[in-house]
Amino acid sequence: YLGSTDSLAFNVTQPSQVVISTSPSEIDRTEVATVEGMLTDGVGRAIPNRDLVLSVDGQEITSISVNSNGSFVGLVPIPPDMPLGPIIIGVEFLGEDFILPSNSTVVFTVFAPVSVTIDDLGPVAVGDEMTVSGTVKDNLENGWLDSHTIEVFVDGVLIGITSSQQDGNWSLQWVVPESVEIGNHSISAIAPAQGFYRQGSTDSNFTVSFHTEISLQVEGSYATRGG
């Protein structure tokens, strides 16, 4: 048998890895989520100077670049009307000749800040029934919160718990006890953290005064005209 040869061309590809170093975390509306990591090959060697795709819940939002040592940083602004709860931020390398594509994700949980108000309070006296009222809303212009728990404190002592209505208004009736001293007092309304809503609070003041009365005393039952 005479000798013979043959040849076959083939491509050698290597896997890639998008390694996100940012841990899952919480973020508020209007803040900016930062996602950091590295692009490496299958054995952890850096793959520098490539482009990656950044996405939120599967929707591409921008591209970011890998620097010369394989690191990347992606910034995701959270809109003021972002739906509350978990979102998935993805980083994807689309691959190229001889390098396979890869992707990775990290979860951020979106929260809303909460603002609470207390309506102006007039002076009251011991034994009077005082109405404490106000509003509660999130960061949106018409983001009034329904069925949101409000805790009311006087001088740091809890005096009652109430809940907001559909239009964000809340109120609490409180009878001023005899133990309250005459003078100025602080009052606070706190909306504890609830669901994906942060804690919100506000402070105000009111005055407790004495009840006064005027009594008239007439010395005689008769009066003389011109006398």
Predicted regions, residues:
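Interdomain boundary/hinge segments at the C-termini of tandem beta-sandwich modules
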Residues: 9-14, 106-112, 206-210
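Proline-enriched interdomain boundary motifs that mark the N-terminal boundary
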Residues: 15-22, 112-120, 211-218
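Beta-strand-rich structural segments
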Residues: 28-43, 74, 91, 127-141, ...
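Surface-exposed loops/turns
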Residues: 29, 48, 68, 83-84, ...
